[in-house]
């Protein structure tokens, strides 16, 4: 009886904790509310199954507890029950998988009018590259990476000369405009993650991965690295500032281009803070 009561309390407590938990999503700041919807669908389906299984276990513990003289019935198979379980499991998996596939298709289908922005991760800083007045990014190659050219831009590509390069600073984006985020890594796995954006993707050395977003709320948002990348992983912080388009262009006008930076002799790098400073 006590075991049945404990199981019942676990089921009720788990559901109540989920419904009234103080730890919930941050307010969304992009178009990816669909991702929240798919997570909610998964929570409801798995929560229903969890509750049903726990309540069934509690019922069995109470209904079929040990009694003197009672003998358990031996039933090696039950085809009817097996069919019901198979169909129910299939429906549940399909109900979770189908919305995810629909959202994934939207996630990787970038609008034709999206502006490309490149983000590079390295131990332990973020670098950003935005298109200049020509509206397109120049080509790049990892073989071009050097202290004077940390993002590996092709110096002979005219489209890259007006690219805006920001090292270890903040990224600005205009509100309401689709942005294709190109992701690269210099050294190890990183993951550019802004909780309010919902969208994220691993950054893999030697590959260019991507996702796209449309910011729907102005504000300043924290950037985190969601992939353990070394001793100073915690230092991979930055800000994304979503602002009105006029403010964005005013900020962009104040930034230095690759052509203006390529002649310098030194580049400021992120340093590991040992705690002795």
From Swiss-Prot:
Keyword check for Cytoplasm: no
Compartments, as annotated in UniProt: Cell membrane
Residues involved in Cu cation binding: 190, 225, 229, 233
UniProt keyword annotations, A-Z: Cell membrane, Copper, Electron transport, Heme, Iron, Membrane, Metal-binding, Translocase, Transmembrane, Transmembrane helix, Transport
GO molecular function terms noted in the UniProt entry: copper ion binding; cytochrome-c oxidase activity
BP terms from Gene Ontology: ATP synthesis coupled electron transport
Entry's EC annotation: 7.1.1.9
UniProt GO cellular component terms: plasma membrane
Reactions catalysed according to its record: 4 Fe(II)-[cytochrome c] + O2 + 8 H(+)(in) = 4 Fe(III)-[cytochrome c] + 2 H2O + 4 H(+)(out)
Cytoplasmic domain ranges by topology: 62-83
Biological role: Cytochrome c oxidase is the component of the respiratory chain that catalyzes the reduction of oxygen to water. Subunits 1-3 form the functional core of the enzyme complex. Subunit 2 transfers the electrons from cytochrome c via its binuclear copper A center to the bimetallic center of the catalytic subunit 1.
Protein name: Alternative cytochrome c oxidase subunit 2
Gene source species: Bradyrhizobium diazoefficiens (strain JCM 10833 / BCRC 13528 / IAM 13628 / NBRC 14792 / USDA 110)
Phylogenetic classification of the source organism: Bacteria, Pseudomonadati, Pseudomonadota, Alphaproteobacteria, Hyphomicrobiales
């Amino acid at each position: 009886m006590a075991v049945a009561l404990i199981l019942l309390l676990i089921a009720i407590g788990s559901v109540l904790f989920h419904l009234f938990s103080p730890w919930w999503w941050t307010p969304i700041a992009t178009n990816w509310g669909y991702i929240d919807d798919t997570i909610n669908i998964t929570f409801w389906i798995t929560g229903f199954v969890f509750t049903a299984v726990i309540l069934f276990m509690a019922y069995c513990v109470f209904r079929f507890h040990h009694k003197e003289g009672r003998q358990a019935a031996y039933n090696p198979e039950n085809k009817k029950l097996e069919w019901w379980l198979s169909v129910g499991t299939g429906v549940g998996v399909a109900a979770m998988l189908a919305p995810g596939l629909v959202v994934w298709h939207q996630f990787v289908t970038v609008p034709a009018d999206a502006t490309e922005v490149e983000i590079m991760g390295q131990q332990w800083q973020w670098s950003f590259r935005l298109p200049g007045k020509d509206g397109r990014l120049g080509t790049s190659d990892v073989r071009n990476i050097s202290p004077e050219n940390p993002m590996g831009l092709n110096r002979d590509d005219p489209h890259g000369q007006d690219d805006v390069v920001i090292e270890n600073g903040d990224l600005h984006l205009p509100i309401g405009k689709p942005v294709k985020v190109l992701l690269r890594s210099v050294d190890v796995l990183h993951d550019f993650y802004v909780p309010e954006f919902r969208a994220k993707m691993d950054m893999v050395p030697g590959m260019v991965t991507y996702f796209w977003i449309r910011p729907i709320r102005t504000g300043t948002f924290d950037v985190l690295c969601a992939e353990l990348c070394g001793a100073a992983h915690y230092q991979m912080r930055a800000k994304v500032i979503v602002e009105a388009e006029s403010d964005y262009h005013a900020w962009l006008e104040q930034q230095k281009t690759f052509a203006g930076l390529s002649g310098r002799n030194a580049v400021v790098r992120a340093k590991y803070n040992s705690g002795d400073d």
